Structure formats: C-alpha cells, structure tokens
A protein has these predicted regions:
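Long helical/loop segments within the catalytic core of UDP-sugar-dependent glycosyltransferases
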Residues: 88-92, 96, 100, 126-200, ...
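Short, acidic, metal-binding catalytic loop of nucleotide-sugar glycosyltransferases
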Residues: 45-54
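A conserved acidic beta->alpha catalytic loop
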Residues: 46, 61-69, 84-86, 117-118
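Conserved donor nucleotide-binding strand/loop of the catalytic core
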Residues: 58, 69-99, 141
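Cell-envelope/extracellular polymer assembly enzymes that use nucleotide-activated donors
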Residues: 26-28, 56, 207
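Acidic helix N-cap motif at the loop->helix transition within catalytic regions
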Residues: 41-42, 66-73, 122
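Acidic donor-binding/catalytic loop of UDP-sugar-dependent glycosyltransferases
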Residues: 67, 114-129
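Membrane-embedded multi-pass helical conduit in multi-pass membrane proteins
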Residues: 279-363
C-alpha cells in the first residue's frame, strides 16, 4: 500500500508536490555510523543490491575507532569520515549535507537508514517511484524484527506497528502528514538540505518531521516500501533509548516552540502530527486516564455524589476510543498472537518511571542499542 492520496481542497498540508526535474529520480542512501563495523556487513549489501547506476550509498563515519570506514569502503559504499565525533546522528547528517552531500539537490531523493536497518524487497524501487510521482517527503513502513522472547520488546513492537498501520494509515487517508521515524525516511534533496541544517537535538526524526511540516510539505506513508528494524536486545538498552526520546522531546519543545506553533496552525492535520511526535508515551497517557476514571468512579460510589459520577462517566467515554483502537490493532495480521501479552500492559506503563529518571540524568553519548545481526548474536550500537 502506498498511502499518499491527494489533499482535499483547501487543505493546509499537501501530500503531493511537483518534482523539480523530469529526469528519473536518483537515490542517495545515507547511513550515519559510529563504531558500527560489526553491523555494516549485514546492512550494506542488501542496500547496494537495490541501487541503480547513478545512485549513491554514503556511510558517515562519525569518529569511529573500530574500522567502520574500512568496512564500509570494502563493501562498496562511499565514506565521509569525521575525525572528531559529532556526537549525534542529527549532527552527523548536518555535517555530511554541508560537505560531501552538498551536491544533492531537488533531483535527488535522500533515504536515511540506521546502521542496522535492512531494506525490504523492492524498497528502493518503491521509494523511487514515489519520488517520480511527486512525493516530497515520505516514511517507509518500519517493520520491527528480532523482538520475540521479551515481553516489553514485544509490546513495544506491537505499539509501533499499530501506530503505523492504524494511525498513519488514517492520517494518510485524510491527506494529513505522518511522522518520520529515524530510519526509512525519504526526503527530496532540497527539502532534506533545508531541514537538516537546523538539527540540534538527539531526536532528529522529530525535528525533521516538524521542519518539513512547518514548511508546508506533506509527509506520505509509503507502506509499500518496508525497512526491517531490529529492536533493542535488552530492556535496559530499550530504556536508555526511550530516555533519550523523552529528553529530546523536552529540548524540542524548548528550542523549536515556534516551529511547533507553526505546525499547529496548519489545522487538524498539523495537530494530529504533533500528537504523533510529542504526545508520548501513549501507554502512560492511557493509563493515567484509566486511573483517573477509576478513582472518580470509586469516589462516586463511596459518596453517592452525582457531581463526581458525571466526570467519571466522561473519562470512561474518553478511554473508549483507546479500547477500540487496541481491539483493532490486535486484529492486524502483524500483531496476532500478542493479545495474551496485554496482561503485562501495566508493567509496560510502569516501565516508563525509571525511564523518566534516566531522562532527567545528565545526557551522555547518544546510544541506539540494537541487535547486531540477523541471528542470535547481540551487540549494542555505541553512538
């Protein structure tokens, strides 16, 4: 499915725009890497196999000490090596765009992948077709893999799939933009260059989403193209990753509040997009609503007070869409078999408490721990 319908008349956000050139779209795949020599042999060959003559594959070696640049060159990628680490994926992308990637213009499409992500069958071809159809920015379907065997990992993967297959599909059907997700992000070259120079936090996917939407461009859900994305190998690694997200959300609100207001001013589509990137974590928000409703219901039953019954009923009605959403999500082919895991949902919500503590601590080097290979071996990314 390529969910990229035209926007309705009068919509503030347009899904499809004209490509600058009539020539076939060229693709440049960009992978920012810090000490990823163990991962790149699994990532680069599937990418190279899908490229056409004229396309490019770049690995940004951000001050690695493990031979990342050597491994990337041996695999056939072009390498831009930064001797002093930029410290984050967003900063590495900005550095590349200002130097080795300065030739990328509106006739190119920029596909950003993580060092451990693997494109699905015909992924690049589907994204190229989207560019030629006039798509300015889009997000491939991020398909979680290597998450079986851990309750928290399985619940996280289920949540990620439901958000894409339900929420993003609904937004696309209404001509609204969807969020970018860090890997599988496709942007036309000129749009990428304009947005990437403003990156300054460690959640570059949220920043790029806001910058592109605030500029009036649509972000299409390109679910015909899939990117396989391994999940963190342990709950501890996943907690560190999510702590970085929470910390980044605070920085985004503090540093880009004008951009947030500009996106909100674009109407329902903009507000929906803001909810997608900033109203997180959803599990905690739903849990808070449920606890508040149960508390009010208990008070009403104890005091027999009608003024308390009314808000309790309203809160339960507010939770009803979440229950319907969950029921629909568990009927998806990709999430079948996970219904029994819902007994651990309260644990998943409570898991965010130590994450909030981690987020409040001093920020260290950016980390995105993942499985190292498509087998049972695990190793964290050390960025």
């Amino acid at each position: 499915m390529m969910a990229a319908p035209s926007s309705p008349a009068g919509s503030a956000v347009h899904t499809v725009e004209s490509l600058q050139a009539a020539a076939p779209a060229r693709i440049v795949v960009v992978i920012a890497a810090h000490n990823e020599a163990a991962l790149l042999p699994f990532t680069l060959p599937p990418v190279l196999a899908q490229l056409q003559p004229g396309d490019e594959l770049w690995v940004i070696d951000d001050g690695s000490a493990d031979g990342t640049a050597r491994v990337a060159r041996a695999a056939g990628a072009q390498v831009a090596r930064r001797a002093r680490p930029a410290g984050s994926k967003g900063q590495a992308l900005r550095w590349w765009a200002a130097g080795a990637g300065a030739h990328v213009d509106g006739t190119w499409g920029v596909l950003v992948l993580d060092a451990d992500s693997r494109p699905g069958a015909d992924c690049v071809a589907q994204l190229r077709a989207a560019l030629q159809a006039g798509i300015v920015a889009g997000q491939a379907l991020v398909q979680p893999v290597d998450y079986a065997g851990g309750v928290l990992r399985e619940l996280g993967a289920c949540s990620e799939l439901m958000e894409q297959l339900l929420d993003d599909t609904r937004r696309a059907a209404r001509g609204w933009p969807v969020r970018l997700r860090g890997t599988g992000m496709l942007l036309r070259g000129d749009v990428f260059a304009a947005a990437v120079r403003r990156l300054c936090t460690r959640i570059e996917d949220v920043e790029l989403t806001l910058f592109v939407a605030a500029a009036g461009h649509g972000i299409a859900a390109l679910h015909a193209a899939q990117v396989l994305d391994p999940k963190p190998a342990s709950s501890r690694d996943a907690a560190r990753q999510r702590a970085r997200w929470l910390r980044g959300q605070v920085r985004v609100l503090r540093m880009h509040w004008r951009v947030v207001l500009a996106v909100a001013a674009r109407g329902p589509g903009g507000l929906s997009l803001l909810g997608s990137v900033l109203a997180k974590p959803r599990s905690v928000l739903v849990a808070c609503k449920l606890l508040a409703a149960l508390l009010l219901a208990g008070l009403a039953a104890h005091a027999h007070a009608l003024p308390i019954v009314v808000p309790a009923v309203l809160l339960f009605m507010w939770i009803l869409p979440d229950a319907i959403y969950l029921a629909r999500g568990l009927r998806l082919p990709q999430t079948r078999g996970l219904a029994l895991r819902l007994v651990f949902a309260p644990l998943y919500a409570l898991w965010w408490l130590p994450i909030a503590v981690l987020a409040a601590r001093r920020e260290g080097r950016w980390r995105s721990p993942r499985r190292a290979a498509p087998d049972t071996t695990t190793a964290p990314l050390r960025w």
